[in-house]
């Protein structure tokens, strides 16, 4: 491809609203153009990258035995009403009416549609298992679209759905999809981790996320360097350190702590470690009032709390309810002498001589101990976020925390949708059974941004070779002034094309600095510079995008050498 025949629309500066480096670089490199809030046009350069990612995904999905189809983007409301999600999915679902006043939505996901296909077409166990997938544009009405294509309203997704006669078959395909996803992300050239995750709004019984590791990631991931353990911080088990609770070292005393409400403020005021303080959070569930206890330096994990059956619908208590129950405003709550049911985190049981609220405004209690000053908590659960240094749940070391960008998610849905929509089959004995189901998603357009978050420098993008828009750029210095430069550049260009190399010849009448800057910005991994001086010695200059210095190649061997480099 010649630049003169291509649409290269680079910018020197990114628009002010671009926050993430990937958003800034995608706009500057001309990969995307903004149409409206959360809406982007994929320009020719960006589309080449998308197509390469889609090609890798299709190859690996097809190799796994999955079958590609394409479902409508617009769904009738009746399907979503069958599962109950029409009313509960939330404002992210964009709902519309046709001219006949019939309700539809732009599909944010396709469980209902694929189950409708399965219940119509699959009748016998002989047709199972089967795995369908599509690559399609989806729409979610994000309340605050941001970060470019990372959180856009319209995005491209690969979603797959499998149907099974039993759980064993589902688990086999689930493992196969995990392996397939690992191959996809490895081929793309991403550094990633597969982590155990919460099923969220999709539901089901098992779930794993695939995260591209990046400091800008929205999600926190807990992992153990000494093993394969990894989990989203929402799900990672906080294992107690196993330290026996010490005997009391002091007498409980009430201390004035004026205007000190947070554990950190109290710790600073009293000159004690914050981990020696205890926080009490007031919540309600099922109309009942509870106190949740955590160590002062730990954070509540709401996902874990909601998994406790009697706290599934918990809410933080209103101040009026707190005062009615505790005769004390928030900020000074504690577990001593209260009637409320006490739910404690595991780490609380290891505490002794701790400081907590005195249930009196402006006061805290110090040197508080279980068994002496108050009974043990009514119930104990894991209700906190893990912190770096916690024991790994697999017993093989300690946990570290990194940031990640979610690019894939797999679920064991079981019968969550198939039962509600009556997707059944006849088993070997002629009995009617409900199909087991799995679903598997990849954020195709999000991968482009995630890859950039991992691969960039001060000059621009450094795409992995497998998804770079072009493998090689040829920059002829003096193309419009020197016949020799033009001739040799054209020869090398044609030789590279014949060798199957995706090459971009910069035949613009531009300064070399502009051409170099554009090539580095858009992330082409290899570059050949042709100039009169080097041609006199039969040489051209080669430099990889990550190389600090260029090297000279023989003009006669340049095409074959580049072909080998690009093939590695």
Swiss-Prot record:
InterPro entries membership: aa-tRNA-synt_IIb, aa-tRNA-synth_II, aa-tRNA-synth_II/BPL/LPL, Anticodon-bd, Anticodon-bd_dom_sf, Pro-tRNA-ligase_IIa, Pro-tRNA-synth_IIa_bac-type, Pro-tRNA-Synthase_IIa_type1
Q: Which transformation does this protein catalyse, written as a reaction?
A: tRNA(Pro) + L-proline + ATP = L-prolyl-tRNA(Pro) + AMP + diphosphate
Q: Where are the transmembrane segments?
A: none
Q: Which GO terms describe its biological process?
A: prolyl-tRNA aminoacylation
Q: Where in the cell is it found?
A: Cytoplasm
Q: Which GO terms describe its molecular function?
A: aminoacyl-tRNA deacylase activity; ATP binding; proline-tRNA ligase activity
Q: Which SUPFAM superfamilies match?
A: Class II aaRS ABD-related (SSF52954), Class II aaRS and biotin synthetases (SSF55681), YbaK/ProRS associated domain (SSF55826)
The UniProt record lists the EC number as 6.1.1.15
Q: What class of enzyme is it?
A: ligase
Q: Which UniProt keywords apply?
A: Aminoacyl-tRNA synthetase, ATP-binding, Cytoplasm, Ligase, Nucleotide-binding, Protein biosynthesis
Q: Which GO terms describe its cellular component?
A: cytosol
Q: Mention any Pfam family matching this sequence.
A: tRNA_edit
| The keyword Glycosyltransferase belongs to this UniProt entry's keyword annotation | no
Subunit? Homodimer.
* Record family assignment: Belongs to the class-II aminoacyl-tRNA synthetase family. ProS type 1 subfamily.
Relay the domain remarks: Consists of three domains: the N-terminal catalytic domain, the editing domain and the C-terminal anticodon-binding domain.
Q: Which NCBIfam families match?
A: PRK09194.1 (NF006625), proS_fam_II (TIGR00409)
Q: Its function?
A: Catalyzes the attachment of proline to tRNA(Pro) in a two-step reaction: proline is first activated by ATP to form Pro-AMP and then transferred to the acceptor end of tRNA(Pro). As ProRS can inadvertently accommodate and process non-cognate amino acids such as alanine and cysteine, to avoid such errors it has two additional distinct editing activities against alanine. One activity is designated as 'pretransfer' editing and involves the tRNA(Pro)-independent hydrolysis of activated Ala-AMP.
What's this protein's name? Proline--tRNA ligase
